[in-house]
Amino acid sequence: IVRCEFPKNKLSELSEIQYINFISFISAPGEPEDTGGRSLHRSNSINTQLNNGRKYDASGVSVCVNDDGFVGPHIDFKGRTEQSTVANDLNGDHGDMVAGILGGAGNLNPQYEGMAKGAKIHVRQYSSSLPNSVQLNNDSNVMIFSSSYGNSCNAGYTSLCYQIDREIRLNPSLIQVFSCGNSGNSNCGYGAGSGWGNITGGHKQAKNVI
């Protein structure tokens, strides 16, 4: 295989060379796709840059990121985090990415503005039992809890699923949101073949979660 550049008007000439069997255009340069998240999720339509557009940026709303420890310091989160329970947990950076997608302000680069740039972000260390969610919801008005962690294949509708469903049922303003699709090559014993075991963790089987 030979890669080369040549003028478009020479394509016919090139194709007539006897030892050339096949000609194809090269792929376009790769582009990061995560920056299109706001438009894919339509959050750009409720928090627009237009003077007369909607400005719902989640100001006054509290959310929680259950992840791998302290987030930042970063100007995209300045003045909007509560991290007292992870103050000395400085090891991971997965939570920084998740928090940025959720509520980055786009101060450093507007292209990376998150879904809810005005939200107050409570940061906690992830635990599969999601402890104290109800307490945070009741005491600090935290509405959305985001957990982008998996803990192996599902074991069906477990006692943990029941616990989370019950908490949500009794506290209607509490919303649990989980990652999915990150284990798309797994079967997880479903019997449908590779690609079906893409939701990891017992709590993700609950009926009232997103």
Role assignments for model-derived ranges:
Residues I1-N51:
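Autoinhibitory propeptides
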Residues S127-Q135, S194-N198:
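Alpha-helical scaffolding within the catalytic cores
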Residues K8-L11, I17, G95, A99-L102, ...:
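Extracytoplasmic/secreted envelope proteins and their assembly/folding machinery
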Residues S146-S148, Q176-G181:
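Active-site neighborhood of phospho(di)ester-bond hydrolases with catalytic His/Asp-centered motifs
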Residues D67, I164, G181:
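Active-site glycine-centered loops adjacent to acidic/histidine catalytic or metal-binding residues
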Residues N182-Q205:
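Glycine-rich, charge-decorated loop segments at or immediately adjacent to ligand/cofactor-binding or catalytic sites
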